Swiss-Prot record:
The gene is MBP2C. Expressed in seedlings, roots, flowers and developing ovules. This is Protein MICROTUBULE BINDING PROTEIN 2C. It comes from Arabidopsis thaliana (Mouse-ear cress). One of its GO terms (molecular function) is RNA binding. Residues 1-15, 34-46 have a biased composition (Polar residues). It is found in: Cytoplasm, Cytoskeleton.
Length: 326
């Protein structure tokens, strides 16, 4: 391939490729000099050479473009195209004069060169067709790869969008979960506070219940005590009535004599010998003890307490001690 490109460059150098005034640049009005027209004896061969050169010149940019942009495994080395400047008209005139002097040798060389150019052109056509086919295949393969990549990219974008939506949903769920946890924590604190208040209320209720039971017990005890006091009071009143009768009997020193005599036999009372020995001092003490006992009993009735009852009991015992002496 590199040799073919070098051959193309040689042809371009010989035919004046690269100048704006060259016939290869598309100037159809440019005519050869008289010396050059005299040197070209075979016009058909010249037309053939021009067509081949034109085709080759049109193929060179395609090959160069392909070699610059499409690296193939079979063409790992790249050759660079070197464009030479077209000779001036004066140099072309000099070359025409020199060519007119050597026409027979030039014809022979031109004939051989034309054969080589035709062979090379056929090879170049085949190579160009092969390169064009390979380029088409490469372009098709690249298009397929690009389409596949675009499809994969679209799928990736869809996956990313789906992941983004899922992430947003997860974030929303996480926020809702955190809000729910906060509400649950607040409810737990409220429940604990209510439980503490309920415990305090239960304790207070138990205290009140105990106080009520104590009050009921005290009331019951007080009622029982009142009954006992009433019984004791009744007994004391009975004793007082007994002692009163005794004192009234003792207070009578002599009996009342009748105004006149009766024939009936008087009733004989039993004699109480222990009353004869009682003097006035003992009777006065017993009377004072009786009055003190009566006062103690009255006080106990008014107050209804243990102290009054104790005093009444002491007064009764003192009175009994005086009475039972005789």
């Amino acid at each position: 391939m590199y040799e073919q490109q070098q051959h193309f460059m040689d042809l371009q150098s010989d035919s004046g490729f690269g100048d704006d005034s060259s016939w290869l640049a598309g100037d159809d009005d440019l005519r050869l000099s008289p010396h050059q027209s005299a040197a070209g004896t075979n016009s058909g061969n010249e037309n053939l050479d021009r067509r081949l050169l034109k085709d080759l010149v049109e193929m060179v940019p395609l090959i160069e473009h392909y070699m610059e942009h499409k690296e193939r495994s079979s063409f790992k080395r790249r050759g660079s195209m070197i464009y030479t400047k077209m000779p001036s008209k004066e140099s072309l005139s000099r070359r025409g004069r020199n060519a007119s002097q050597t026409v027979p040798g030039r014809k022979k060389r031109d004939q051989e060169g034309n054969d080589d150019v035709m062979n090379n052109s056929r090879e170049d056509d085949e190579n160009a067709k092969a390169l064009a086919g390979a380029e088409k295949e490469e372009m098709s393969r690249l298009r397929e790869q690009v389409n596949d990549l675009q499809t994969k990219l679209s799928e990736k974008e869809e996956v990313l969008k789906s992941m983004e939506m899922s992430k947003n949903q997860v974030n929303e769920i996480q926020e809702k979960l955190e809000a729910t946890n906060r509400l649950v924590a607040e409810k737990d604190m409220l429940i604990k506070s209510m439980q503490l208040q309920l415990s305090d209320t239960k304790i207070k209720l138990a205290d009140k219940q105990a106080a009520l039971e104590k009050t009921q017990w005290e009331a019951k005890t007080t009622g029982t005590r009142a009954i006992k006091l009433q019984e004791q009071l009744d007994a004391v009143e009975g004793d007082i009535s007994t002692f009163t009768r005794v004192f009234e009997t003792l207070a009578k020193t002599d009996s009342k004599k009748p105004d006149r005599d009766y024939d009936a036999v008087p009733y004989e009372f039993d004699h109480l010998p222990y009353l004869d020995d009682v003097d006035e001092t003992d009777l006065r003490k017993m009377e004072e003890a009786r009055l003190a006992y009566v006062a103690a009993v009255n006080t106990a009735k008014e107050r209804e307490d243990e102290e009054s009852l104790v005093m009444a009991a002491q007064a009764r015992a003192y009175l009994q001690s005086l009475a039972f002496t005789y």
